[in-house]
Amino acid sequence: MKLNELKYTPGSKKEATRVGRGMASGKGKTATRGHKGQNSRSGGGVRPGFEGGQTPLFRRLPKVGFTSLNQKQYTILNLSDLETLGLEVINHESLIDHKIIKNSSVLVKILANGTLTKKVDVKVNKISKAAKSAIEKLGGKVEVI
């Protein structure tokens, strides 16, 4: 058997029904839309979320929360990530070189998930207390910028 001899299993590929292609096709004239009414018209149908005049769900439910404009997004790095990187110095330049962050304007935070086995010097925007103590316990330096 060759690639050009491959065939689909009979019945596995069903052809789409073409509507509005003449009366003889059996799906002509109204083309499965029925007679008159909003849905039979071009561009007909109701907007998403419309419930026939009943107060829609999005208006029945209360407004909740908001998006803070002052929120800062941090790229999270765990101690296990620092271990796999295997670097002695972790700063924005080294993270950009290893394609962890795109540019120096990205904020970086280190958390204490995982374990660290070797000394690492860290210079990041934020660090958790547990991560800081784990790094300093191994003789590494932590600087928050």
Curated annotation (Swiss-Prot):
It holds the Pfam family Ribosomal_L27A. One of its GO terms (cellular component) is cytosolic large ribosomal subunit. It comes from the Bacteria. Gene3D superfamilies: 3.100.10.10. GO terms for biological process: translation. Residues 42-52 have a biased composition (Gly residues). Residues 1-54 are annotated as: Disordered. One of its GO terms (molecular function) is structural constituent of ribosome. Part of the 50S ribosomal subunit. Belongs to the universal ribosomal protein uL15 family. Binds to the 23S rRNA. This is Large ribosomal subunit protein uL15. The lineage of its organism: Bacteria, Bacillati, Mycoplasmatota, Mollicutes, Mycoplasmataceae.
